[in-house]
């Protein structure tokens, strides 16, 4: 692989990593009915809208959390989002679980390759469990303070 191909591969992987943070569970919901949304009020949220930074911090109409409403958080330019989905299909998205796990499965239409993108820890108060789990995994302990090797010896 030459330098140009290697740089392209790194760019593709960085884009996939960024896209994995998209709130794809919001597809099909509607933008809040608010005039600040400039013609998008009460319209359906599309795949492209999720990643498009134009709609960053736009709130949905049917969010379920009063304190922390559902909002879009895209970081792609409109052109970048369009090109991304011309190249990749979103196959499956697992939104954050209680433990903080989230992953997205993409398919590259050109290379016919699959990519499983697993998101990292998000630092939100309601997801403190995720940080605690990461800590225990990092020190090789379970929640009771017993190391994995001690538990293994007890069997």
PLM features per residue range, with description:
Residues 1-62:
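N-terminal low-complexity, Ser/Thr- and acidic-residue-enriched intrinsically disordered segments
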Residues 35, 45, 49-155:
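A conserved cap/lid and substrate-binding interface adjacent to the catalytic center
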């Amino acid at each position: 692989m030459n330098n140009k191909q290697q740089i392209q591969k790194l760019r593709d992987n960085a884009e996939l990593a960024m896209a994995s943070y998209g709130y794809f569970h919001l597809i099909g919901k509607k933008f809040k009915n608010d005039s600040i949304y400039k013609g998008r009020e009460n319209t359906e949220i599309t795949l492209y809208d999720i990643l498009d930074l134009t709609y960053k911090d736009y709130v949905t109409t049917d969010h379920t959390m009063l304190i922390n409403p559902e909002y879009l958080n895209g970081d792609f330019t409109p052109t970048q989002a369009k090109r991304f989905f011309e190249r990749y299909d979103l196959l499956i998205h697992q939104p954050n679980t209680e433990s903080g796990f989230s992953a997205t499965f993409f398919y590259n239409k050109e290379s016919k390759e699959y990519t499983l993108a697993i998101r990292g820890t998000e630092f939100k108060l309601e997801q403190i469990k995720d940080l605690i789990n990461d800590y225990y995994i990092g020190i090789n302990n379970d929640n009771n303070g017993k190391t994995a090797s001690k538990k293994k010896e007890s069997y």
